[in-house]
From Swiss-Prot:
HAMAP family attached to this UniProt entry: FolE (MF_00223)
Superkingdom to which the source organism belongs: Bacteria
Protein name, entry field: GTP cyclohydrolase 1
Record keywords, A-Z: GTP-binding, Hydrolase, Metal-binding, Nucleotide-binding, One-carbon metabolism, Zinc
Annotated organism of origin: Pseudoalteromonas translucida (strain TAC 125)
Subunit text: Toroid-shaped homodecamer, composed of two pentamers of five dimers.
Gene coding for it: folE
Catalytic activity line of the entry: GTP + H2O = 7,8-dihydroneopterin 3'-triphosphate + formate + H(+)
Leader peptide range in chain numbering: none
Length: 184
């Protein structure tokens, strides 16, 4: 994969009229290929690998919230970055997930070519699958470079998406508790 990506970046540099052998660009295809491999490593990870058996038996049955998980992803339409934060809440049903695993779940799905709507859904379904929670709520807030750097060039715009599963969808009180908690 690395050599194919490297060649692709050399082609892009040439196509825009630059010299890939110019001093400042000489190692750029190699560096860009390495960066792209990292930014898309979510395709080569599984939920089982990243959660690594960090699901623990627990009597906890009240809402658990992990807030402000930073994320970096690539829009599938323009291959430009979007950055933001994710808030995840769930109601345990006999099992809790190790805290760092929430960030790993976010990263696994964010490190793919994505749209924010799908990313939010994938995170929620993964938390539900791993924990067996009676409810999951996920909110993602992000700024999209495809809207800020090109097109309409709106630098202050942001997008917010949410997915509510189980109790978070069925019970307005649960959903409102989640929304109030993330407001601080």
């Amino acid at each position: 994969m690395h050599n194919e990506l490297k060649q692709g970046y050399e082609n892009i540099i040439t196509a825009v009229g630059e010299d890939p052998n110019r001093e400042g660009l000489l190692d750029t295809p190699k560096r860009a290929a390495k960066a792209m491999e990292y930014l898309t490593q979510g395709y080569r990870q599984t939920l089982e690998e990243i959660t690594n058996n960090a699901v623990f038996t627990s009597d906890a049955d009240d809402m658990v919230l992990v807030q402000d998980i930073e994320l970096y992803s690539m829009c599938e339409h323009h291959l430009l970055p979007f950055t933001g934060r994710c808030h995840i809440a769930y109601i345990p049903n006999g099992k809790v997930l190790g805290l760092s695993k929430f960030a790993r779940i976010v990263d696994m799905f964010a490190r793919r070519f994505q749209i924010q709507e799908q990313l939010t859904h994938q995170i929620a379904k993964a938390v539900e699958e791993v924990t067996g929670a009676t409810g999951v709520g996920v909110i993602v807030e992000a700024k999209h470079m495809c809207m800020m750097m090109r097109g309409v060039e709106k630098q202050n715009s942001s997008m917010r998406t949410s997915v509510m599963l189980g109790n978070f969808r069925a019970d307005p009180k649960t959903r409102n508790e989640f929304l109030q908690l993330i407001k601080g």
